[in-house]
């Protein structure tokens, strides 16, 4: 069978920095990005389109004096995604979005042996969670034009106290308030970290924190499609809560040439919410979003390691994380634990840069990540013009792992009387790895089957020019 995949993207960045006097700096950052993907599959006799868009703006002002540092930020962001797809003679339009606008102020100051920082934050959110419309021969289905608005306000205060040349404690309290659907939530979140410094190079730490999350990210696709949506806490969807403990070790050599860090953590999670349906369900039943949200508890644990070299001709870092993210939902099973939708068992990153001289340098990076969990359909068939589906264990399957290597050769030069410039030759995906973007259900000889869609760029060389001013 023939499949045509077309992909287009555009990204725009603008950053303006102004030093407004000896004590003030202003920075304006603007970003807009849009991606379009068309998947034409002969089995479907339909063109499936996926669009997603990000827009962000931030205005930052920093004022510093001998007594304090004040930072203020005004932010705006908007995210949208739209999916148009068809199976046989049935078509689906699915769209989601979230808009945020906010203000934050942070103040840092020192008094005696205490280093203080505190601040306030306010955010307004507007949600459009999963608007959909289905039409065709199986079923007509449509959601009302549902909107959500929410307001979040936070205030926090934190102190870094030196108890002894070898001991210090970082403690604070964050008070958050969230209002949506006529319901208000108020949550005090205490946090404390104890540091022990047996020498100037070694640090041991113990951390405990209580955290609340009012926004919930739901994954709609069972095959890795980027069609997640955001929804708000409400009387029926309580704020997520996490009790977090961590033990850490950090080594820093003389003159900060080398750094080594290790952290082991455990998080106990309450009021966890995930989306248990799939895109296929829109075609097979009279659909209500709330009927496909499951609620439960969970835990995360893992180990993070990092080795970093900061100076010398050879510099870079290696980081590795191994972890597990498990959930239990009474709607699925009162006793069985499942992988979280966002579980990532292994995550490895390597970044290396070698500077031959003041003009030439060679850099490279390698990334590896375990595949995303998803719920695989065991069978899908048509009975009396109706689609019928049967699923396996919730998040019981995984997409293949992804890995990739990139390299870049850079030449830096400064013509007499001009600013520093550089030319860059890079190769993306050096060994032409075919990573799986997502999987989808398609017809194969009158039966449904899973098919992988692979990344378009087997290997991508590029040339870049940079002018510093």
Language-model region placement:
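Gram-negative outer-membrane beta-barrel transporters
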Residues: 265-268, 289-378
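Transmembrane beta-barrel strands of outer-membrane/channel proteins
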Residues: 28-34, 72-78, 118-124, 171-177, ...
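Outer membrane beta-barrel strand-and-loop segments of large Gram-negative receptors
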Residues: 100-106, 143-156, 238, 255-319, ...
